């Protein structure tokens, strides 16, 4: 099985790349693709860059050049679930855009025109992620809605509006829905694994800088444990 793994920033992919064997690196359009073996599987680890546009470019290039059988999006996120702490993990039950609004044409809030309102992860990948949770010890993981937008959320007013629009949201970040939308259009199975780096509040910027390495490592360990289940 060939697995594509996408993270936005260096701390989100560093442990994965360090753990690979027989790896080779290729850079296309400023995006690095590292191909090799990880946990007994053929993988391509991609550092996409931050935001929905770069994530879309990276996902499209990954699919077109390497033809992966599945894609895992890994990295950090801001937490919205009361029972999760920094470093805990959210496994996608569905993925939505939180900054899209074409409701004037009859679409749901967050739904891009001519696209589904929610992008659903592959059931087998989610099941593998659930099995992988047990190997992480004290780290807690839940399934939940992950929402995506091109903003770092640290404003209580913005947070309140987002929760009004998406009351079941467990985490928000800046790439997953773009990756999921590309996977949807190419019919490539996907799952999103995100570890919390902050709680999407006034302290988020400080928390993010302090905890991004921890969040990136936890998410990477979860991805490796997931791959071992495939």
Curated annotation (Swiss-Prot):
It catalyses: S-adenosyl-L-homocysteine + H2O = S-(5-deoxy-D-ribos-5-yl)-L-homocysteine + adenine; S-methyl-5'-thioadenosine + H2O = 5-(methylsulfanyl)-D-ribose + adenine; 5'-deoxyadenosine + H2O = 5-deoxy-D-ribose + adenine. The active site is at 12 (proton acceptor), 198 (proton donor). Gene3D superfamilies: Nucleoside phosphorylase domain. GO terms for biological process: L-methionine salvage from methylthioadenosine; L-methionine salvage from S-adenosylmethionine; nucleoside catabolic process. Pathway: Amino-acid biosynthesis; L-methionine biosynthesis via salvage pathway; S-methyl-5-thio-alpha-D-ribose 1-phosphate from S-methyl-5'-thioadenosine (hydrolase route): step 1/2. InterPro entries: MTA_SAH_Nsdase, Nucleoside_phosphorylase_d, Nucleoside_phosphorylase_sf. One of its GO terms (cellular component) is cytosol. It is an enzyme of class 3 (hydrolase). Pfam families: PNP_UDP_1 (PF01048). The keyword Disulfide bond does not apply. Keywords: Amino-acid biosynthesis, Hydrolase, Methionine biosynthesis. Its EC number is 3.2.2.9. The keyword Zinc-finger does not apply. One of its GO terms (molecular function) is methylthioadenosine nucleosidase activity. Substrate binds at residues 78, 153, 174-175. Belongs to the PNP/UDP phosphorylase family. MtnN subfamily. NCBIfam families: MTA_SAH-Nsdase (TIGR01704), PRK05584.1 (NF004079). Catalyzes the irreversible cleavage of the glycosidic bond in both 5'-methylthioadenosine (MTA) and S-adenosylhomocysteine (SAH/AdoHcy) to adenine and the corresponding thioribose, 5'-methylthioribose and S-ribosylhomocysteine, respectively. Also cleaves 5'-deoxyadenosine, a toxic by-product of radical S-adenosylmethionine (SAM) enzymes, into 5-deoxyribose and adenine. This is 5'-methylthioadenosine/S-adenosylhomocysteine nucleosidase. It comes from Shewanella piezotolerans (strain WP3 / JCM 13877). The gene is mtnN.
């Amino acid at each position: 099985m060939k697995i594509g793994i996408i993270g936005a920033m260096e701390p989100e992919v560093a442990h994965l790349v360090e753990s690979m064997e027989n790896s080779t690196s290729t850079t296309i359009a400023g995006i690095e693709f590292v191909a090799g073996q990880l946990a007994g599987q053929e993988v391509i680890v991609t550092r996409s860059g931050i935001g929905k546009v770069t994530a879309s470019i990276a996902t499209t290039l990954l699919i077109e050049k390497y033809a992966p059988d599945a894609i895992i999006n890994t990295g950090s996120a801001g937490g919205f679930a009361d029972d999760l702490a920094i470093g805990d993990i959210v496994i996608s039950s569905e993925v939505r855009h939180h900054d899209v609004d074409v409701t004037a044409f009859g679409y749901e809030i967050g739904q891009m025109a001519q696209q589904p309102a929610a992008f659903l992860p592959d059931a087998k990948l989610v099941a593998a992620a659930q099995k992988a949770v047990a190997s992480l010890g004290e780290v807690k993981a839940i399934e939940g809605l992950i929402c995506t937008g091109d903003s770092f959320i640290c404003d209580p007013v913005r947070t309140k509006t987002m929760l009004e629009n998406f009351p079941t949201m467990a985490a928000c970040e800046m790439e997953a829905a773009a990756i999921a939308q590309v996977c949807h259009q190419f019919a490539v199975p996907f799952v999103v694994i995100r570890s919390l780096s902050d709680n999407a509040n006034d302290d988020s910027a400080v928390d993010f800088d302090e905890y991004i390495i921890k969040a990136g490592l936890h998410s990477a360990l979860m991805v490796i444990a997931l791959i071992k289940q495939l």
